[in-house]
C-alpha cells in the first residue's frame, strides 16, 4: 500500500480541482500519440492519425483523452485504494486490448508535462513530486494484471 502524506494529498487534490478534464485529457492523449507514434496502433479505430494536425483535431482522440483523464480523477478520489480502483481497467488493457504496460508510464510522463504547461505557478517542485508519485502508482496499478 502506498503512503500519502497530508501535503501530497493536498497538492494532488488542490491541483486536480483546477484541471479541465476534457482539455487536458485530449492534450495528453494527443501528445502521447504524436510523441510516441507506435502507440497509435492501439487506436486504429479512431480514424485519421496521420499527422499531428489530424491527431489534435480528431474528435475520438479528444473523447478518449477525456475518458482517460476522468479515470485519473478516480485515482485522486481513491488515493488509498488505487490498486482496486484500477483492477478492471488493468484486466481490460491486459487481456482484451493487449496494451504494452510501458505505455501507462509514458502517458503518466505526458500528463506531468501537460499539467506543468497548464499550471505553471501551481506546479511547484513539491507538486510535481506528488503528481509523479501518483502517475507512477496509477501506471503500476494498471500494469498489475500483467504480472
Curated annotation (Swiss-Prot):
Alphabetical list of CDD domains matching this protein: Hb-beta-like
Pfam families found in the cross-reference section: Globin
The protein's assembly and partners: Heterotetramer of two alpha chains and two beta chains.
Single GO MF descriptor: oxygen carrier activity
Matching InterPro entries: Globin, Globin-like_sf, Globin/Proto, Hemoglobin_b, Hemoglobin_oxygen_transport
GO CC, any one term: blood microparticle
Tissue specificity remark: Red blood cells.
Annotated heme b binding sites: 64, 93
Taxonomic lineage from the root: Eukaryota, Metazoa, Chordata, Craniata, Vertebrata
Gene3D superfamilies hit by this protein: Globins
Organism superkingdom: Eukaryota
Keyword ATP-binding appears in the UniProt entry: no
Role according to the record: Involved in oxygen transport from the lung to the various peripheral tissues.
Listed name of the protein: Hemoglobin subunit beta
Residue ranges annotated for the Globin domain, each copy included: 3-147
GO biological process: hydrogen peroxide catabolic process
Family designation: Belongs to the globin family.
Keywords: Heme, Iron, Metal-binding, Oxygen transport, Transport
